Amino acid sequence: MKRLENQVAIVTGGGTGLGRGIALALVAEGAQVVVCGRRQAPLEKSVQTIQLAGGEALAVVADISDESDVERLVQTCLQGFGKVDILVNNAAIDGGGSIHTHTVEEWDRIQAINLRGPFLATRAVLPIMRAQHHGQIVNISSESGLEHYPGDGAYGVSKHALNALGEYIQRENQELGIRVNTVCPGMVVTEMTQNSPGLDHSKCLYPDDIADLVIWLVTRRPNIKIGTPILIQTMENPWT
């Protein structure tokens, strides 16, 4: 029996890159998966890839920062698969630039996707997980959520806040068998980063590296808790 047999997972930002890699890894372990994102075509590609591998998946076009879209996402999961066991808050947008150069609109959009989105998704699944006395939430943050890189302010602030959100949710729900973990990757080669000038791909992480860690987190013994965000990096500086 596969380790996630009969488990149902939602992966936000599941149409490309890291999200697709995590979704495929969950399916390989037996989970049924709902992927969501803002673009139909990449989501359909993820579902097609999963189905060709013999898995089950649904796609939901949704803006993770929109409350009604998030409610529709969770309801689609319940209607399709009957429950929610795992939530992976992966959807995010980048936003380089110093704090003083950001427009209010840029700032608000970054916080909306990177922080409000995980809050809304988590709030939507927690009543389900609390009622069933089990559930796992994995937040995909960033090394920028642990460091303070100049020129990365709005994004970094959103990820620092996401780390804190995860710790609060863990402490508020652990007595009901709900685990919350936060993963802080270094530079990952994805659609968003692959054309970055000066980036040496051989010294970067790849989606499978993060997916492997997520699988370990959601398949370890139930009584094991990770107390702090997990930093995962390569051994070398990827910037040339």
Regions found by a protein language model. Name each.
Residues 122, 158:
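Active-site helix of classical SDR
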Residues 31-45:
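Conserved glycine-rich Rossmann-like NAD(P)H-binding loop of the short-chain dehydrogenase/reductase
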Residues 142:
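Residue(s) in the substrate-gating loop at a strand-loop-helix junction
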Residues 61-73, 104:
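The beta1-alpha1 cofactor-binding region of Rossmann-like NAD(H)/NADP(H)-dependent oxidoreductases
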Residues 15-17:
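Conserved glycine-rich cofactor-binding loop
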Residues 98-99, 106-108:
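Substrate-binding pocket helix/loop in short-chain dehydrogenase/reductase
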Residues 175, 182, 199-238:
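C-terminal helical subdomain
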